[in-house]
């Protein structure tokens, strides 16, 4: 995609006086950067003054030649809300349907969206859109119109070739309409073309991250936590040996007793020719300032009880030798987490070391498999049935990545049963991961059910193999992933889309949510598909270089292709110039397992 220049103008008396209170402007700039590649974004804050607003907009239109300007704030009913009035005087063409579309989609989220008066229109070669001032509303509005912006810019700029390209891509697609849940195919084209555009993987991920809300800002909580105690809280011995005064020199010393880990520090007098036998981690006596390790001593005498009474110190003691001072590892009021780490092992262990037992909130997840043909692995297989492997696979994947499945259920191909089950599940869970029922068959009811339940379907198809019908939908803070029913498709789309969303909701940093990626060399030629393909492969290490061997037949129904799969190789779509991925070529690969190297040569 070519570069689009954006401007984000925050219009608010409060933010103009206190810029740190502007949250909507930074959110918009972040969303633009995440959604559009090679994008230039400038921003500013102005007060709710009509003349000043117009002056800034004119400068951006004429001098900066921005293609899209998004204003945030000043669209309500308050006396100083004048953004639409300031904008209208600059517009050569108004775009009422675009404004209506934003309003209608926003009303699905809150009835108060009806109180926004934002305008959309064209001034010169610039598209101007008035968005509300709240952070939440800005995010929702941007998600509504982001996919339309490139085509709108092409139309305004009379970029004929790009306009024709977009028209060609959408030509023949059926218009999205309500589908009767009990309807079967009539044989007409409208039944056989998906109303959902096929979105690129990265665009789908951007939509997911911009939609899913974190259950808690774990990163913020952790980064602001200070240590309530010193670690160690006392001077601790680093080694097994003898605690003494460093001024006492080497030679024979009388052993006064033994101090073990867990004993209280003693404050008894200690002469220069005396010492205490001490264990690793034990507290030093108050008057001792060093430890001589047991290897640098020689036992001279035992008392009548078999306890050490005399020992020869073979080295000169030095102050601070083998002693951890108070607070050496962590001092009171130090930040506990100098950097973020998504690992619950790290987080819980470090918090436990300072006496803090943090209960990490995890998203509640349910697994649903649809299909009248499915039979539980515990039951006898009957004619026309197949065993349900998806429920087991998805449940185990959740556990493997540190999450729990609260509920599982298998549904027959019934609109009403599917609707009732989803309603019940969303009463108690945050995410439903469903396999099957999202394609174009006349028994695929899932998308119709979602529409009936007033979920917003953000994505109905992805430009990917396997997994094209992958669906993502939301309603407020409830999220639905519809994975294809073929086991391998469900496996791939879980890793690429559902897992990152659940991690993000759990408080992980966005950059840590997706699978780790490394580069691998192909061992053999592989025929490319018309869609970008994620191929299951095992990894072989040869002299420090990583090679990928494709795991046999990659058909989406063949679950055996995940056996021994270490990575998903990300292969590009086929072109006339490049029909093959050739042996020796390097491609990015998403890592599936912690132990991702199957063989060393």
Swiss-Prot record:
Domain of life the protein comes from: Eukaryota
Top EC group: transferase
Pathway: Cofactor biosynthesis; molybdopterin biosynthesis
UniProt KW Ion transport keyword: no
InterPro entries listed in its UniProt record: MoaB/Mog-like_dom_sf, MoaB/Mog_dom, MoCF_biosynth_CS, MoeA-like, MoeA_C_domain_IV, MoeA_C_domain_IV_sf, MoeA_linker/N, MoeA_linker/N_sf
GO molecular function list: ATP binding; metal ion binding; molybdopterin adenylyltransferase activity; molybdopterin molybdotransferase activity
Cofactor field: Mg(2+)
GO CC annotations, alphabetized: cytoplasm; cytosol; dendrite; postsynaptic membrane; postsynaptic specialization
GO biological process: establishment of synaptic specificity at neuromuscular junction; gamma-aminobutyric acid receptor clustering; glycine receptor clustering; inter-male aggressive behavior; Mo-molybdopterin cofactor biosynthetic process; molybdopterin cofactor biosynthetic process
Stretches for region Disordered: 173-195
UniProt key word Protease: no
Keywords: ATP-binding, Magnesium, Metal-binding, Molybdenum, Molybdenum cofactor biosynthesis, Multifunctional enzyme, Nucleotide-binding, Phosphoprotein, Transferase
Function: Catalyzes two steps in the biosynthesis of the molybdenum cofactor. In the first step, molybdopterin is adenylated. Subsequently, molybdate is inserted into adenylated molybdopterin and AMP is released.
Family: In the N-terminal section; belongs to the MoaB/Mog family. In the C-terminal section; belongs to the MoeA family.
Name the UniProt record assigns to this protein: Molybdenum cofactor synthesis protein cinnamon
Organism: Drosophila melanogaster (Fruit fly)
